[in-house]
């Protein structure tokens, strides 16, 4: 693992254009070398874009692997590069929505879905804004130590372990003026989740956004990072959500998924398709991904 970190260190010393090209190559290779993830991505796209042809979905998935390869090769930038270099690669759009809320003394939750440029954007944002964020412990000890070191490189973030739960989040938000960075769009199982639609499919979704907003009186401000053709990233902030929370947790969680879906449709190749977003199914419904092992052997694309 330390050897991999050294490789990333030397990669970040390359010109940015070369890092992008190397990442694109790695993504292309991964598309063909990791059939299990390829299958998961294809199942997700079939569920979300059933009206598309197989050719369209395959083209988008290949582009998504390219984006993921770039994300992977950029980790050296996030961990080792000069902070000013990172800042130059990220531009803000409508950041006044966040600035105005913080200036008014509001508690803020940044709704921050998993787009492929999310790491680069947040490493730039954290230079300007202190953040509260969740952290999932890595299985590999060396990786866990490196990720934590990277997260704390500006001494401007407070991390809460995912196992600490809602109470730890509320406690930290109440004693801090920092926004809470909320990444909501993964399947953590049926416990403490609700089923609401995502691209028309019932999907286990954590209703934490509504509950945390209600318990802290926080304003919800979405922030979406998108990558441009030159590799730079635009982090766009959206207006504070009005009438949120509404008192109806299901309606609030559906509103969140609808917003994320709308943003995904704008940049579908940049959304994170390689995890099992639809893994947990309602009672009696079969596993969408159960053919993964067979498909991994037979899919030659």
Question: At which residue positions do the language-model features occur?
Answer:
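Membrane-anchoring hydrophobic helices of lipid-metabolizing enzymes
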Residues: 1-112, 144-148
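A broad structural signal for alpha-helix termini and local helix breaks/kinks
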Residues: 14, 33-34, 49-50, 155, ...
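Residues that cap or flank secondary-structure elements
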Residues: 33, 89-90, 113, 139, ...
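Short glycine-/small-residue-rich flexible loop motifs, especially phosphate/cofactor-binding loops
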Residues: 42-43, 122, 148, 193, ...
């Amino acid at each position: 693992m330390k050897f991999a970190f050294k490789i990333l260190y030397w990669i970040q010393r390359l010109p940015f254009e070369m890092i992008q090209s190397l990442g694109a190559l790695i993504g292309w290779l991964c598309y063909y070398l990791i059939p299990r993830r390829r299958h998961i991505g294809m199942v997700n796209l079939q569920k979300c874009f059933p009206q598309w042809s197989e050719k369209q979905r395959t083209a988008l998935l290949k582009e998504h692997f390219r984006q993921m390869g770039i994300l992977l090769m950029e980790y050296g930038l996030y961990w080792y590069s000069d902070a000013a270099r990172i800042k130059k690669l990220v531009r803000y759009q409508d950041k006044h929505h966040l600035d105005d809320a913080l200036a008014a003394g509001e508690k803020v939750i940044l709704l921050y879905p998993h787009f492929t440029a999310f790491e680069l954007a947040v490493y730039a944002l954290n230079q300007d804004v202190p953040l509260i964020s969740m952290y999932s412990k890595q299985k590999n000890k060396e990786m866990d130590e490196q990720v934590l070191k990277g997260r704390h490189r500006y001494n401007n973030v407070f991390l809460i372990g995912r196992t600490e739960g809602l109470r730890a989040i509320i406690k930290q938000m109440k004693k801090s003026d920092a926004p809470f960075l909320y990444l909501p769009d993964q399947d953590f199982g049926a416990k403490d989740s609700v089923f609401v639609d995502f691209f028309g499919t019932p999907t286990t979704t954590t209703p934490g956004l509504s509950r945390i907003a209600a318990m802290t009186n926080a304003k919800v401000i979405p922030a979406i990072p998108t990558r441009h053709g030159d590799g730079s990233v635009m982090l766009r902030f959206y207006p504070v959500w009005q009438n949120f929370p509404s008192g109806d947790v299901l309606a609030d969680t559906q509103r969140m998924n609808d917003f994320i879906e709308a943003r995904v449709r704008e940049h579908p190749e940049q959304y994170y398709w390689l995890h099992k977003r639809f893994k947990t199914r309602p009672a009696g419904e079969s596993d969408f991904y159960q053919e993964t092992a067979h498909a991994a052997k037979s899919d030659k694309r």
